[in-house]
């Protein structure tokens, strides 16, 4: 049962606590968040890099509008699918929200499965300056005029170590690296080597992480069921509406989200009329006038669903790895585990089930 067997008589959760409920996709963390919200003590902060996008509802398993009204979430529906939102943006927004929630006499409850965000909160980010909007506009103009391959070649000259790690298709990171260099005169790899600064190092706050790592076979069944429900609820049509309502590029972070990426690939493979509204690396995609029969569409559709399922399981696999790393880096000391005393300002406990995490947290309220 993870750490839960070793926890005895834990102290009450202090007023300066920041609680982080961390678990893989489809593991049931949202339901627990709702129960905690109903105690009247918590405000929910979403830790999900897909829920930030407006109009991306079905494929992200976003809470319904009625749920969001009953259980308000911070950092949900905050940008359009055409926009970008960095880890640094998330940390900055979270810092402000944590302070505001504490001022209201409540406890921040961070809930979600974007483990990169949690790693930034617990382990810190390199002190990379924010990009000047004018520099960003200049680099974007370069990308549109020269193409991403030319920018990658440029990056290999100014920051060879980073260029080796980034594939040509990683538009977001390539442009970000060039923005940093053009603004500071130093390569991004230089900034990444500097000491990191973590929001959770604030001595005035107590950060409590609950890392839930359920049985994988059980989780795989939950993932398969969730995807079946998404397709039935109109996920494919949702992507069509996004392409109709927004000027989207297949390389935008929103369209690289699991599920959305596989639908885009299907549209391209079947020469779907919607691809005329899509761009790839800034270049328009034209219909080829292919005659795609129903049998081919059916095969391509099943392939899309299989790939979405596989990609979601791979996402969960990565989430387990990140969770284990967080626990290894911030697990409680032996003294804390046996006494239950709160002697550390930042700690991550591991649990095998959401129910175990629930029992532990409610014992501290």
Curated annotation (Swiss-Prot):
Keywords: ATP-binding, Magnesium, Nucleotide-binding, Transferase, tRNA processing. GO terms for biological process: tRNA modification. Residues 48-51, 172-176, 256-261 are annotated as: Interaction with substrate tRNA. The record marks 114, 136 as: Interaction with substrate tRNA. Substrate binds at residues 25-30. One of its GO terms (molecular function) is ATP binding. Its EC number is 2.5.1.75. It holds the Pfam family IPPT. It catalyses: adenosine(37) in tRNA + dimethylallyl diphosphate = N(6)-dimethylallyladenosine(37) in tRNA + diphosphate. ATP binds at residues 23-30. InterPro entries: Dimethylallyltransferase (IPR039657), IPT (IPR018022), P-loop_NTPase (IPR027417). Its cofactor is Mg(2+). Monomer. Belongs to the IPP transferase family. PANTHER family: TRNA DIMETHYLALLYLTRANSFERASE. Catalyzes the transfer of a dimethylallyl group onto the adenine at position 37 in tRNAs that read codons beginning with uridine, leading to the formation of N6-(dimethylallyl)adenosine (i(6)A). This is tRNA dimethylallyltransferase. It comes from Psychrobacter sp. (strain PRwf-1). The lineage of its organism: Bacteria, Pseudomonadati, Pseudomonadota, Gammaproteobacteria, Moraxellales.
């Amino acid at each position: 049962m993870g750490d839960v067997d070793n926890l005895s008589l834990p102290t009450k959760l202090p007023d300066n606590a920041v609680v982080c409920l961390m678990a893989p996709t489809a593991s049931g963390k949202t339901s627990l968040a709702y129960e905690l919200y109903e105690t009247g003590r918590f405000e929910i902060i979403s830790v999900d890099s897909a829920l930030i996008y407006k109009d991306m509802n079905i494929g992200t398993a976003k809470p319904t509008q009625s749920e969001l009204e009953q259980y308000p979430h911070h950092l949900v529906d905050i940008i359009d699918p055409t926009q970008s939102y960095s880890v640094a943006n998330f940390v900055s927004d979270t810092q402000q929200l944590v302070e505001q929630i504490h001022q209201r006499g409540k406890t921040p409850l961070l809930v979600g499965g974007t483990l990169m965000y949690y790693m930034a909160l617990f382990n810190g980010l390199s002190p990379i300056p924010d990009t000047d909007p004018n520099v960003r506009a200049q680099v974007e103009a370069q990308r549109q005029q020269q193409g991403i391959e030319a920018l990658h070649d440029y990056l290999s000259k100014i920051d060879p170590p980073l260029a080796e790690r980034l594939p040509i298709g990683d538009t977001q990171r390539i442009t970000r690296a060039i923005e940093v260099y053009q603004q500071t005169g130093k390569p991004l790899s230089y900034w990444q080597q500097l000491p990191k600064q973590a929001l959770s190092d604030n001595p005035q706050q107590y950060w409590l992480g609950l890392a839930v790592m359920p049985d994988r076979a059980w989780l795989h069944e939950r993932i398969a069921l969730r995807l079946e429900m998404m397709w039935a609820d109109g996920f494919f049509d949702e992507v069509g509406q996004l392409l109709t309502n927004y000027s989207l590029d297949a390389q935008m972070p929103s369209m690289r989200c699991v599920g959305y990426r596989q639908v885009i690939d299907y549209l391209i493979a079947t020469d779907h009329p919607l691809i005329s509204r899509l761009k790839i690396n800034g270049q328009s995609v034209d219909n080829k006038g292919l005659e795609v029969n129903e049998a081919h569409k059916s095969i391509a559709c099943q392939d899309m669903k299989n790939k979405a399922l596989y990609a979601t399981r791979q996402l969960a696999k990565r989430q387990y790895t990140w969770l284990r790393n967080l626990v290894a880096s911030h697990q409680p000391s032996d003294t804390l585990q046996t006494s239950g005393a709160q002697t550390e300002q930042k700690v991550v406990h591991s649990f095998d089930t959401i129910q175990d995490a629930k029992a532990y947290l409610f014992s501290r309220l």
